[in-house]
Amino acid sequence: MTVETFKPKQTTTLDIPVKTLEAASTNAVTTGNRIGFVSLGCPKNLVDSERILTQLRIDGYEVTNSYDNADLVIVNTCGFIDAAVEESLDAVREALEENGKVIVTGCLGAKENQIREVHPDVLEITGPHSYEAVLKHVHKYVPKPEHNPFTSLIPQTGVKLTPKHYAYLKISEGCDNRCTFCIIPSLRGDLDSRPAGSILDEAKRLVESGVQEILVVSQDTSAYGKDKGGRTDFWNGMPVKQDITSLARQLGKMGAWVRLHYIYPYPWVDDLIPLMAEGLILPYLDIPMQHASPRILKMMKRPGRVDRQLEAIQRWREICPDLVIRSTFIVGFPGETEEDFQILLDFLKEARLDRVGCFKYSEVDGAVANTIAELISEDVKEDRYHRFMEVQAEISAERLARFVGRTLDILIDDVDEEGAIGRSFADAPEIDGMVFINGETELEPGMLVRARITHSDEHDLWAEVVDADTQD
């Protein structure tokens, strides 16, 4: 089941935009108890939105895509960087102006005073993953329908804000690291891993519902299970170790693509690479490295042995030659010198990463990094950002060119009058590139097709469909 949420009028400034769907559920019952919903932020926040929406539907509420038709509006906010805070406050403002009855939840909700200073008329405010509190507040202002005969129509997977063929699977909350640029632990707490059996149950339901790609997310995915003290959980009567490698191995047996996001560079990440080489999980590693200067990494409270990171990348590629590595970096961190920045550029040239995102340092309210060194001017940050992206564009083009002439499985995301648009194992939805298959207008979203790569640039691939039995 998909539910239509609506998109605020302001332009999004985040990598993951305001989530909006094209088609509303056709079996939603008209109850007069209508809730509007705005979901902002990252995929982890998206999962929180899906859980709230699922419970709203179970409770008999109708989710509407119009401010005018809503009895109340929920805004699930992001509060990680200043731009996200501004966007969230703008979304709350718009909801108040257009509707008047607003409940705020999500990461920014952990800073109630900040919201109240700008928007004192908000009805209620809760922090992140406060599902029960959100529902309690909804019941207070919009009475729960006495009976809804259609709740049995809600699938076991619940409400999803993603296309039917892929879904995010959140395996834990919080983080035990204390990176100086990040305030996530203060918003979402320390690491709290879900039981392995619960995760695998959810994954099984997703696959049985037609999901072809599971995107594993959390604040610190590779730390999964560290808080469990080595305790074993059970699934289908079998013991399952609660660590990321054991979990990934079980997920890989379910017959869907499994893509891992937000991998912190712990030593045991090495154990995941053989699973990728075996084809159990996608050979794709999203591992935010943040910088390469040992001095800056120390100030960030991040792992600082860049030589070991380069050795690891080489080792991983030897084990799994198809491995695609995505990473993110920060330029303009407080105290960053030109020498530090050159070390970062040199690292890029040596590491030859496949996909890279770059962020200009933003002063996050409450982040330790704001006060540990002199702030970098906006002009310098902008200059370094463009120099960084120029270097990486050439590297990305080189890395993508290796696929030309190969035949790959392509998961179709969209089809228009020009053809189909999909992704290979090398491309995560919404953040990486795409594969364009011109002329194939008969394909449908969710199809997995074989296609030969004919062309590439620094971001995307172009391909043509071939017979299913065609090999590389």
UniProtKB/Swiss-Prot annotation:
For this protein, the record's CDD domains field holds:
Radical_SAM
- List, in alphabetical order, the GO biological process terms annotated in this UniProt record: tRNA modification
> What EC identifiers does the entry list?
2.8.4.4
Could you give one GO CC term from the UniProt record?
Answer: cytosol
What cystine linkages occur within this chain? none
* Binding-site residues for [4Fe-4S] cluster 1, renumbered to this chain: 42, 78, 107
Domain MTTase N-terminal as annotated: residue spans = 33-143
Which residue numbers delimit the Radical SAM core domain? 161-398
**MF terms (GO), sorted A to Z:** 4 iron, 4 sulfur cluster binding; aspartic acid methylthiotransferase activity; metal ion binding; protein methylthiotransferase activity
Q: What is its main location?
A: cytoplasm
- Explain how, and how many, cofactor molecules are bound: Binds 2 [4Fe-4S] clusters. One cluster is coordinated with 3 cysteines and an exchangeable S-adenosyl-L-methionine.
Residues holding [4Fe-4S] cluster 2: 175, 179, 182
Which co-factors does it depend on? Answer: [4Fe-4S] cluster
Q: Which residues are in the TRAM domain?
A: 401-467
Keyword Transit peptide included in the entry's annotation: no
Where does this one sit in the cell? Answer: Cytoplasm
- Stretches assigned to coiled coil: none
* UniProt keyword annotation of S-adenosyl-L-methionine present: yes
Q: So what does this one do?
A: Catalyzes the methylthiolation of an aspartic acid residue of ribosomal protein uS12.
The record's NCBIfam families line, in alphabetical order, gives: 30S ribosomal protein S12 methylthiotransferase RimO, MiaB/RimO family radical SAM methylthiotransferase
- Name the chain's protein: Ribosomal protein uS12 methylthiotransferase RimO
- Species source reads Shewanella baltica (strain OS185)
Q: Which gene encodes it?
A: rimO
